């Protein structure tokens, strides 16, 4: 253990330290209520094998076998336990930790009730072709989000039917409509986004899962796991036969901090603060330059009218919102589906080559007004995902539940069909991976989802920032539908370019 600690490497930058390097800013935090796969050449050690055995598991549901993408399972069996121990020590020393929900004092006493974030033991090999494609798309999606957000009529018309059956989206649209009536202009616009993708095993295409425009979380943990993997490979370069520099560095935390600092600078008031909306607390007397919504994307974040009044007050203010109500609405699933329709991208993007690049990554997306697609989904539910207008994970509907939901909605002639969209289910390549949670290593047939963070800052006609800024790689068992790290399904991972 001491040896592992001695080799643990440098501490990855925290959000606070990165923000500090950009500019010294006062920050106010407001709290909200509530607080395949080929069989690997290595054999799992006893601690891993006891959990899942040593035979390569069967691919179920989520993935298809591919040699193009997979975890770099090249360590001798005797090394795996040593790597696990070193990784756990490094995580505790360098802040790659999360709150332990099972600990009674977690979140109540500083430094108490923490455990390592779940992580893959080795990085995921990932084709440079897909990486370059996602990086190239990032500024295009940043620009697209901003342009769509400026078309208030498009947002209102596209989401009009959804509003009738989805009260949460309806409340957001009401605030947006009030801003339109007031002719409220957002001269300075800040967007921190994440576009999530999977590689479709059937077509070898990188397809977009969703575009997130609010509370694009896990950038700090994503940076940490990259440093963890680089450190492990650096310490065992000879045994692993890998180059630590092939693990793609992750600058998400620093670049997002720079974007927030840049927005603060554009506000041009040295006494102003950055307001981070998380949970209940109130501060008065300070001008607010930037409001960052870490919360506010689910109905649970608005338990009373007080929260809705606060959201309206923020939108009416001169503060730079991240996201503004319009940027927030652009991230809804219905808008994603509408943008995939023929000739809609042309409404917002001018360059034909850029339009084709964006369109190429769209998976199949349909409204439930399309009866033939609905019938196809009822007959073959395993090929589709039913998505409501919700963020935060755990909301999508799959398999038999999808079929039953559609049959029920069709039978009732329910207007609630407008609350959902159908999406082509993506089947990414599966590979055998070592995954570590709660100090225990297991061997699983797994698939990955890859997200690219983006930052966009504009003041009227002047684009100040339009960048790709880091990434998030999440790996989960191929048999699972959901993929949230915090929810307990997925594991943090990094990219090893091949």
Identify the meaning behind each predicted range.
Residues 2-498:
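Preference for protein termini
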């Amino acid at each position: 253990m001491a040896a592992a600690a001695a080799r643990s490497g440098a501490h990855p930058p925290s959000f606070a330290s990165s923000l500090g390097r950009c500019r010294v800013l006062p920050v106010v935090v407001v709290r909200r209520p509530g607080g395949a796969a080929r069989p690997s050449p290595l054999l799992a050690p006893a601690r891993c094998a006891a959990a899942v055995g040593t035979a390569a598991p069967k691919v179920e549901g989520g993935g298809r076998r591919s040699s193009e993408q997979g975890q770099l399972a090249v360590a001798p069996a005797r090394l795996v336990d040593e790597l696990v121990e070193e990784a756990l020590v490094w995580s505790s020393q360098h802040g790659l930790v999360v709150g332990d929900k099972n600990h009674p004092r977690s979140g109540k006493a500083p430094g108490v009730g923490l455990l390592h974030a779940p992580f893959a033991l080795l990085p995921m090999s990932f084709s440079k072709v897909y990486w370059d494609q996602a990086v190239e798309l990032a500024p295009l999606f940043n620009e697209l989000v901003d342009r769509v957000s400026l078309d208030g009529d498009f947002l209102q018309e596209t989401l009009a039917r959804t509003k009738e059956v989805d009260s949460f989206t309806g409340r957001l649209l009401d605030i947006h409509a009030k801003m339109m009536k007031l002719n409220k202009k957002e001269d300075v616009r800040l967007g921190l986004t994440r576009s999530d993708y999977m590689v479709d095993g059937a077509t070898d295409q990188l397809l977009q899962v969703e575009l997130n425009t609010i509370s694009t979380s896990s950038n700090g943990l994503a940076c940490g796991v990259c440093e963890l993997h680089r450190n492990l490979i650096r310490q065992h370069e000879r045994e692993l036969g890998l180059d630590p520099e092939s693990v793609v560095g992750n600058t998400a935390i620093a670049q997002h901090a720079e974007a927030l600092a840049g927005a603060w600078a554009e506000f041009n008031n040295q006494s102003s603060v950055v307001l981070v909306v998380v949970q209940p607390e109130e501060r008065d007397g300070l001008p607010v330059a930037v409001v960052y919504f870490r919360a506010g994307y689910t109905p649970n974040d608005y338990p009373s009218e007080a929260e809705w009044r606060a959201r309206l007050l923020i939108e009416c203010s001169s503060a730079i919102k991240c996201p503004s109500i319009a940027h927030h609405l652009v991230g809804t699933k219905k808008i994603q589906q509408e943008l995939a329709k023929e000739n809609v991208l042309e409404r917002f993007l001018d360059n034909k080559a850029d339009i084709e690049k964006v369109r190429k990554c769209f998976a199949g997306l349909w409204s439930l007004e399309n009866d033939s697609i609905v019938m196809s989904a009822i007959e073959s539910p395993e090929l589709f995902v039913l998505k409501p207008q919700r963020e935060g994970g755990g909301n999508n509907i799959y398999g038999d539940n999808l079929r039953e939901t559609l049959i029920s909605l069709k039978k009732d002639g329910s207007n609630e069909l407008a609350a959902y969209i159908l999406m082509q289910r993506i089947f990414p390549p599966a590979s055998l991976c070592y995954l570590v949670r709660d100090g225990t290593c297991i061997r699983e047939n797994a698939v990955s989802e890859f997200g690219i963070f983006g930052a966009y800052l504009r003041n009227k006609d002047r684009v100040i920032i339009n960048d790709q800024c880091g990434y998030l790689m999440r790996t989960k068992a191929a048999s699972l539908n959901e993929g949230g790290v915090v929810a307990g399904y997925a594991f943090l991972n990094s990219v090893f370019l091949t």
